[in-house]
Amino acid sequence: MARTTPISLYRNIGISAHIDAGKTTTTERILFYTGVSHKIGEVHDGAATMDWMEQEQERGITITSAATTAFWSGMSQQYQQHRINVIDTPGHVDFTIEVERSMRVLDGAVMVYCAVGGVQPQSETVWRQANKYGVPRIAFVNKMDRTGANFLRVVEQIKTRLGGNVVALQLPIGAEDNFTGIVDLVKMKAINWNEADQGMTFTYEDIPAEMLSECEERRAMLVEAAAEASEELMEKFFEAGDLSEEEIKTALRQRVLAGEIIPVCCGSAFKNKGVQAMLDAVIDYLPAPTDIPAIKGINEDESEGERHASDEEPFAALAFKIATDPFVGNLTFFRVYSGVINSGDTVYNSVKQKRERFGRIVQMHANKREEIKEVRAGDIAAAIGLKEVGTGDTLCAQNAPIILERMEFPEPVISVAVEPKTKADQEKMGLALGRLAQEDPSFRVHTDEESGETIISGMGELHLDIIVDRMRREFKVEANIGKPQVSYRETIRTRVNDVEGKHAKQSGGRGQYGHVVIDLYPLDAEGPGYEFVNEIKGGVIPGEFIPAVDKGIQEQLKSGPLAGYPVEDIGVRLHFGSYHDVDSSELAFKLAASLAFKAAFAKANPVLLEPIMKVEVETPPDYVGDVIGDLSRRRAMVNGQEATEFVVKINAEVPLSEMFGYATDLRSQTQGRASYSMEPLKYSEAPTSVAAAIIEARKAK
């Protein structure tokens, strides 16, 4: 099959917004206008196109959100047909890994702002992420029909609060109830949408006389921004005082792709005004896959490799989201960076080092899904029934393996016990948790050997709340949740030498005999976490028993002698011991090693480590004193403040155990006007009084 849309006509975009800015309505309207102008034809092979939404409503599960394909030829059909893949960006920036991944899958972004609320604290976080990954973007100021809407104020906020070099492409005609349309400053024409057909049709008109001078002023700023793209244009601009429409668009595109400017559009998605003009801006100014640098990865020999957006290169794709569908199983959404793959082909999962067969491949369109036979560079699609693929895995050609995303998932810092409410829930819960863990690699599940409880662990209270909520909504599993438990660690502070461990049972029959002498010493926290050095000389312990000594110690690390928490940052040097020709065995040396380790650990000044979170609070200036006072009561170390006119950002390091319930407390202190984010930072030694209480509580269990 030949390529139907040239890759230069692709736009892989994310729509990202603060909660109240109207992201959902904007996305719906995009699908409405593109879906109406492009009816999906009869699906090849006579397979019926299945109505996806109906199933979704029955199941209460949103599958369409990960990525949707739409087609757009421009408001006036002025372009060749472009293919726009809209990728959902996670609403929650707490999970950096998710935001990071969606930023990798996008080529460009549309930032949606509310014309009343403007730039909110959460908008800053998403903006910083987009800066970090160099994502070109345009802005859409939505809700121009709302009371208090002010387009130019929001444009100014993007400039002052986010540091964006903004260029207004449009001006609104009226605002609030009187918002009737927009002025296109490139064409210098007013656009009015027809309310009778939900804005499907529109007319170009002359600019209202009372707006003419303001439009001319803004147009001059726009042309100057375009002229700065090159010296030739600058000269032409100085001589003629203007540039052609074509020159303006080409120059602005060049500057957007270089990350130098942010074009801004406006409208009201709810009132069906301005969305098509914003789609035109997506085509005019945001990059095709061929406009962005080749994606980098790691080859099999650990050297750096890359893949260009071309069908000719070896196949490489990134699995960026796994959606669970109770009927078809796993849907793995993936972005193809290079090459071509057909349904039925076998690919290589370079992260898990396993082969997978691509069965059915589907693409989502507005509210339909279409089975397709092949995908090519630049495409975004979903595969049904891949068995072992996890979020962030690379799928590639078997003869050209590459890893596109080095996934180093942070270790979970908080755990809770979950208990199914009924026997029926018990069976479903295991399945549900397994599926959710496959989707989200920063979430873990295990069974506590002592209590038999199921323990779930994740990156914070909110993270686990969302998991439990999804378990109830998507899998219909009701469960009781225990109190949050913090994942502490144990380590040592001083070195101890020549500690022996002897396991000897020699009373009749075959005995057991193992004897080791070790040194135990602390390792740097940045290091490997554990090292084992064998310095046995002269065969005092035969070589075949050395791995058993290492294993005996490693088994002790899972549950430390102090309070049963994992032990880290320790090194062991095995340098002496003895054995018995008949009675020595692997088991005997394993037991001897564990005895030596326990004895050495007790003498090596053992300490308890607690997880410290990096906390960032954004609050209006009036509440700074209350917020800092409250953080200090939580044993926080406040590292500094940054103030802008509207918001003060407080950076602090706080023990996780003190952060439970913080969201509620912060809301009540600041009348709901502050927000915070936190992420794991490091482990630090817990104060003696805190450690003593924790150890006591563990022993009482």
Swiss-Prot record:
Protein's recorded name: Elongation factor G
GO cellular component, one term: cytoplasm
Gene Ontology molecular function terms on file: GTP binding; GTPase activity; guanosine tetraphosphate binding; translation elongation factor activity
GO biological process, one term: ribosome disassembly
Family classification: Belongs to the TRAFAC class translation factor GTPase superfamily. Classic translation factor GTPase family. EF-G/EF-2 subfamily.
PROSITE patterns noted in UniProt: G_TR_1, G_TR_2
SMART domains, per the entry: EFG_C, EFG_IV
One Pfam family it belongs to: EFG_III
Span of domain tr-type G: 8-290
Record NCBIfam families: EF-G, PRK12740.1-5, small_GTP
Compartments where located: Cytoplasm
Binding site for GTP: 17-24, 88-92, 142-145
Gene3D superfamilies (alphabetical): 3.30.230.10, 3.30.70.240, Elongation Factor G (Translational Gtpase), domain 3 (3.30.70.870), P-loop containing nucleotide triphosphate hydrolases (3.40.50.300), Translation factors (2.40.30.10)
Known role: Catalyzes the GTP-dependent ribosomal translocation step during translation elongation. During this step, the ribosome changes from the pre-translocational (PRE) to the post-translocational (POST) state as the newly formed A-site-bound peptidyl-tRNA and P-site-bound deacylated tRNA move to the P and E sites, respectively. Catalyzes the coordinated movement of the two tRNA molecules, the mRNA and conformational changes in the ribosome.
UniProt KW Protein biosynthesis keyword: yes
Source species: Haemophilus ducreyi (strain 35000HP / ATCC 700724)
UniProt entry keywords in alphabetical sequence: Cytoplasm, Elongation factor, GTP-binding, Nucleotide-binding, Protein biosynthesis
Tagged with keyword Cytoplasm: yes
